[in-house]
């Protein structure tokens, strides 16, 4: 079931009548299914934050259409079941953590009893219970992020928009946030993340959308992006001094006495290689595609997309 959709969205800044415009988004289309953790990746200025703001109705589109749960962003009801953590959130400094959550709950129109129950639950979940009565002005960057995630969750949203959710949070806190996000996914919550921490995205995201210069370069699963095409690591049950495969299939390199790296000329030849090895009495213990990091795959994808505009921050 599709819960978030963008259809040919373009957003231009500047004065089109003077011919001076900057394309923040250029004909962007995507769809996000229920229960998916969907990550937006791209260099600074790629348009990730702009897309967030358009989907949430904060910015108008120049052309195109967007829908959240079937409703356009200009309809306030489209945000009724959405939670949002902006990048570098700034909350009223005079509020305490507990008062911020109460305020957020009231904005969603929640009953007082539900606000109290959810606030207490989220303060515990985000490790902020003992700071419930502390004013936000006294919070560290990581504490602001934690309470920011809590306020995004106050309405128990169906869709969660998180812009750099673990920015400023320590390693233990990052692990806790990842655990929370995985738990939310298991309950059917759709999570959309904008993050520069690709190693983090790799461990939690289902689908990745790579943006560059306002355009969608690739939408793919994390598994597809991190699988090295035409390369497989094979572990054999016994040590071999030499193994060859027909050159029209590919070549073999020993990683260890019982580990081979097979580089194929064509990925579809893997079954033929397995049959060939078995016929030559090579007993295969395991076989797995060679993996690359999401970061390496991302950098290579961006390089192939062409020269980048340089921005100091996201747009």
Describe the role of every protein-language-model region:
Residues 306-314:
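Short, charged, intrinsically disordered terminal tails
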Residues 2-6, 11-212, 218:
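ABC transporter nucleotide-binding domains
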Residues 178-264:
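ABC transporter nucleotide-binding domain
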Residues 231-304:
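Short, charged/small-residue-rich alpha-helical element at the C-terminal edge
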């Amino acid at each position: 079931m599709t819960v978030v959709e963008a259809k040919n969205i373009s957003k231009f800044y500047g004065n089109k009548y003077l011919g001076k415009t900057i394309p923040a988004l250029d004909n962007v289309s995507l769809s996000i299914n229920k229960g998916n953790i969907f990550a937006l990746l791209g260099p600074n200025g790629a348009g990730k934050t702009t897309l967030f703001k358009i989907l949430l109705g904060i910015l108008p589109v120049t052309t195109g259409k967007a829908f959240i749960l079937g409703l356009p962003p200009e309809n306030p009801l489209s945000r009724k079941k959405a939670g949002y953590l902006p990048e570098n959130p700034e909350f009223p400094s005079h509020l305490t953590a507990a008062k911020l959550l109460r305020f957020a709950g009231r904005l969603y129109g929640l009953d007082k009893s539900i606000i109290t129950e959810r606030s207490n639950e989220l303060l515990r979940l985000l490790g902020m219970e003992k700071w419930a009565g502390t004013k936000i002005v006294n919070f560290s960057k990581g504490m602001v992020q934690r309470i920011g995630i809590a306020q995004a969750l106050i309405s128990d949203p169906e869709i969660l928009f998180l812009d750099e959710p673990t920015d400023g949070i320590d390693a233990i806190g990052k692990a806790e946030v990842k655990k929370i996000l995985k738990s939310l996914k298991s309950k059917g919550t759709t999570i959309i993340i904008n993050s520069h921490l690709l190693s983090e995205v790799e461990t939690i995201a289902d689908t990745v959308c790579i943006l560059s210069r306002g355009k969608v370069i690739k939408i793919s699963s994390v598994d597809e992006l991190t699988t090295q095409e035409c390369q497989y690591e094979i572990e054999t049950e016994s040590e071999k001094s030499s193994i060859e495969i027909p050159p029209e299939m590919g070549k073999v390199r020993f990683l260890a006495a019982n580990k081979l790296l097979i580089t194929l000329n064509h990925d579809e030849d893997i079954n033929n290689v397995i049959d060939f090895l078995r016929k030559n009495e090579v007993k295969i213990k395991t076989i797995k595609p060679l993996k690359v990091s999401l970061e390496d795959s991302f950098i290579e994808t961006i390089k192939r997309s062409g020269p980048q505009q340089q921005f100091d921050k996201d747009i």
